[in-house]
Amino acid sequence: MKKILVLTMLLFCGMSVAMAQKPAEIKFDKLTHDFGTFSEKAPVVSCTFYFTNVGESPLVINQAVASCGCTVPEYTKTPIQPGEKGEIKVTYNGTGKFPGHFKKSITVRTNGAVEMTRLYIEGEMTEAK
């Protein structure tokens, strides 16, 4: 009787593990964007990072935080279903900043298997003449 009970419990445990959904998983097309060289006369530049939910559960972006107040990320707020795409638009505002090379990071936190991903933007703002 005990053997039947143990076998039944193992069967149910095995079925529940097999039926469990795999978590969401974010996959970006690229992790870095280089703006190249731009003048401080036009100090605001933007780019978009595209991603896909390659997992089997809905993906939610909980937070996207820039390393500096001069960089602003805007992201998809609704859950991204498996196989669907989303985007994070990043704007760098160099107004009042010293000309030269910059590199900033955007930390993206999700409900995915990998909870944190770091994106980077860089470029060189030249002095206005």
Name the predicted role of every residue range.
Residues 56-87:
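Surface-exposed binding patches on compact interaction domains or structured appendages
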Residues 54-57, 96, 112:
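Short, acidic/polar linear motifs in exposed loop/turn regions
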Residues 21-48, 54, 125-129:
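Beta-sheet-dominated interaction scaffolds and their linkers
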Residues 1-23:
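Bacterial Sec-dependent N-terminal signal peptides
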Residues 45-47, 86, 102, 117:
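Hydrophobic core residues within well-ordered beta-strands of beta-rich domains
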Residues 98-127:
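Terminal connector regions
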Residues 88-96:
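Short, hydrophobic beta-strand segments
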Residues 47-53, 90, 104-109:
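Buried hydrophobic-core signal for structured, non-transmembrane domains
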